[in-house]
UniProtKB/Swiss-Prot annotation:
It catalyses: ATP + H2O + cellular proteinSide 1 = ADP + phosphate + cellular proteinSide 2. PROSITE patterns: SECA, SECA_MOTOR_DEAD. It comes from Chlamydia trachomatis serovar L2 (strain ATCC VR-902B / DSM 19102 / 434/Bu). This is Protein translocase subunit SecA. One of its GO terms (biological process) is intracellular protein transmembrane transport. GO terms for cellular component: cell envelope Sec protein transport complex; cytosol; plasma membrane. Monomer and homodimer. Part of the essential Sec protein translocation apparatus which comprises SecA, SecYEG and auxiliary proteins SecDF. Other proteins may also be involved. One of its GO terms (molecular function) is protein-exporting ATPase activity.
Amino acid sequence: MMDFLKRFFGSSQERILKRFQKLVEEVNACDEKFSSLSDDELREKTPQLKQRYQDGESLDKLLPEAYGVVKNVCRRLAGTPVEVSGYHQQWDMVPYDVQILGAIAMHKGFITEMQTGEGKTLTAVMPLYLNALTGKPVHLVTVNDYLAQRDCEWVGSVLRWLGLTTGVLVSGSPPEKRKAIYQCDVVYGTASEFGFDYLRDNSIATRKEEQVGRGFYFAIIDEIDSVLIDEARTPLIISGPGEKHNPVYFELKDRVAELVYFQREMCNHIAIEARKVLDPFLGTDVLPKDKKVMEAISEACRALWLVSKGMPLNRVLRRVREHPDLRAMIDKWDVFYHAEQNKEECLEKLSSLYIVVDEHNNDFELTDKGMLQWIEKIGGAAEDFVMMDMGHEYALIEEDATLSPADKLNRKIAVSEKDTQRKARAHGLRQLLRAHLLMEKDIDYIVRDDQIVIIDEHTGRPQPGRRFSEGLHQAIEAKEHVTIRKESQTFATVTLQNFFRLYEKLAGMTGTAITESREFKEIYSLYVLQVPTFKPCLRIDHNDAFYMTEREKYQAIVAEIISAHRSGKPILIGTESVEVSEKLSRILRQNRINHTVLNAKNHAQEAEIIAGAGKVGAVTVATNMAGRGTDIKLDEEAVAAGGLYVIGTSRHQSRRIDRQLRGRCARLGDPGAAKFFLSFEDRLMRLFASPKLNTLIRHFRPPEGEAMSDPMFDRLIETAQKRVEGRNYTIRKHTLEYDDVMNKQRQTIYAFRNDVLHAEDLFVVAKEQIEHVALALAFLILKDAHADHCSLPKIEEWLSYSFPVKLDDQEIRRLGDVDAVADYIGDLLIEAFDVKFSAMLAEFTEIIGSAANAQGICNDILRSVIISHIDEEWKVHLVDMDLLRSEVGLRSVGQKDPLIEFKNESFLLFEGLIRDIRIAIVKHLFALELSLTRSDRPDNAIPTVATAFHNHDNFRPMELTIVGEEEES
């Protein structure tokens, strides 16, 4: 029925494209009409369109004329030189109808899927121009600094011709320049640059003049699937050095390495013994029928199953798994031990290991044997695995009648510190084990200049400046014997998902979005529109070639490269990691094939390498970093030879990454071909393939070195990729659900902070905080007054110590009502505040000689006090929230929903945060002691003093001393 309706009415995509096609015709009509205008008359269209918008016309109504103006400018610029990245290039682009179609979709808030080489960069200029007419912030988000700079210089020339200003944000841009850049009509930059500026404006800036942004109206995200999906699990974090250096990584690194060594040696021994049994059969296609021999083979495979749980990448294990029947027997034991009735036997077998590694879920578990080895042979402590029951410990202290109240307090503090140290040690131990067992050099990270540099798993690019969280980075530093740096403390954080929700309008463009259309719709309310190509795609997509082993796969890849190289075709070989790219490079060198390698270790030459990758006879080995934002342009000889030949050395866990690699060839009607070479030892196949795989392998098993190719295998790959994509989507959605809780708190704190930064009269803000504190105290006093053991005297003692006021017990009892008591306490505190700061203001005025400047100084002091306490308490709150997030997962054991638990407890934490901020501010205001002392200068220096205060620049003539409560105590 649905198919019939689609044939009759067309799909939703077709209906949208048909509707937009009418607008394309209007745009072309406007372009033709504007051809008769002079350059000055065409430029004048920009202020005219701006005025019409201000007069009430909608952008939708202005769209045909605005897009027509842009198209006409592109036509006029044809043949003119534009300087891009230091080179002069001739402008040669005029928007096609399909590009105008994509531009309309982006203005309407769609994600446009346009194939490689279809001109996404030029397409974006039209909606950027239209939305910039509003005068509101318009941003183009790219995946790296190079593309941001290039796009601003290249297509930004159209916007500048029309009188708009453009700016580009790159890493290292100083704050004073950033402020000017954000004032431009259109700003180009990466997601991290925009995101970090947002965090800095709301967590680092201490004056409104230090804030650089001007809001969020419209953004187009280039390669939107990379930004909002691939990087969605990695939050933007502003952090600084932690207050304390955790020595546990240095102390335990050698012991952990020793434990992992014991595990490796034990697994190697088991594997070697198993191979002695299996060696005679590794070169045969059929296993013997003898029952005793088969029992021995089965037991050897059982032993290798155990090895797979201890060292999944063991060489003997990988070699044996090349044999389809033996592979099936190992997997059969895996199925056997997963059955509920065999769980006890499974645990017994696993207990013979020191550590059980779960490669599928990227986790591990220390066994009892491993703990015993740690304690008895390696020199660890039993306390490393036993956490303290703080409730029990505190109860024992309270029951000890020999201790005074002060001794009990000191004992509790000591126990708490001991618990903290023990937890830190246990956490460090676990992270060191994770670094050794699950993090691989040249796959997850590289070592460069005595530092660990993260490799982005999706792009293959290095991420200098980024660090793994929760001590994992320090653990890897310890593992690789580089300098172990301090753990960082988070000052501010936001996920890209929630950052881009700040924009009123959001659109995107990419060559690969349709496979993730569900996620874009459910999380971002963005719909994907596939835009037709300008010219038919001539790419030849060969069937995947499957090989039994990795060794056979690489032999076939090299043979294919040699064959294609002889024909003169440029070849791009895509690899999944630095390790694989270097391995393939070694093989090519052995075969004397000249080639270039592009990976995280030499990414600085990316533009140069890509520029030469389309020349006849070029061979380029690249990680996924060559998959985005780079068009490989062919020379004439390369086109004649058949175009770019893309070879994939494995399938990525995401179908999009594979499509991106294919998309490097056959751009804009060029010839090209793509082929993937796979083995059943590839990570995707090993971890996520269907259980039916062994049956297929045994049925289709070819002779040594021959490939298998069948639609059934293609479906197998797609199923595995969908399984991984589904898992990753669940993780991203789960992350967002938790971050949504944090996001509401973040917005509340940032709004409060911004109100303080922009407030004209900080005395009013300070008094508001005093009133809130008074209300909290009133609740506390009246709640305590109705309790069985009233401790009102203790509250009054604390109050008189913190604030210069004394409460009247009889007055409080007479009032009785919370609001009345709050007003009573508030009046006392505000009166004391007025007395204190009126005297201070009078003193400043007398010294400076200007009441206005004295008022400005007091405002700045109050602002500084309030902002500092917001920031300090927020940092502590972020740590508390991280701890809560890590703890609530265990609540599921007690049949509780961790997310609901997190929401409930985070609300209580946030209430406590607001209370703590207000109390800290008010206590500091009353503890503050300020004095201005004249410098040893003649009286004629006083006017300069006033100017210095007014400008708040480089304070010299007078000294300002701030004494807080910590210093007093």
